[in-house]
């Protein structure tokens, strides 16, 4: 069986998984994939409250460093928040499935979130100013109503020896106020939303089921 035709392992962790412990487990899995000892994997989990700084992070974007623990990590991107109610999706996958094109892979991740949210009647989109998935909300004022961009999912990726890892953070029902301690994505006045904040109540299990279905369908269209 071709290395790109092997099945991917789906792992779902219950409870809150410590961020640094998750990094160790992910790094170990990546090394096993490189050595062809284990299959590629998609790991679904949640973290305790934490701020993480990617390789492009500017610490001036950390507005409240005492609010939660702050960890510098090796994923791409800038500052983000992780916490309960947010679905973390760590994708450990061979970049050869995407013609070794990191932009194509990121496009796949964005497409995955957009199609999964659509299953729950949430319309979302890419934004040319920042990687991730965004949606609109109506902002009301005395003079007029207008649509504003709100981020609903973040993407941060790293590649080691042609294996991509880290992945996605999708806001299902986190405490949105916890994002106030940072400038998400380094974009001043960036606004954040969630599935719940969009008026949709779903369980993690329902989201995971839809995500897996869309992942398997999309992978067939993206893989060479």
Can you annotate each of these PLM segments?
Residues 1-149, 201-205:
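N-terminal lobe of the biotin/lipoate ligase/transferase fold
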Residues 51-52, 162, 177-178:
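Short, acidic Gly/Pro/Ser/Thr-rich loop/turn segments
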Residues 94, 157, 195-197:
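Short, well-ordered beta-strand elements within core beta-sheets of diverse protein domains
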Residues 152-155:
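Histidine/acidic-rich helix-loop-helix segments that form or flank divalent-metal centers
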Residues 161-173:
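Conserved phosphate/anionic-ligand binding catalytic regions in large, soluble enzymes, centered on
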Residues 174-224:
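C-terminal accessory segment of soluble enzyme catalytic cores
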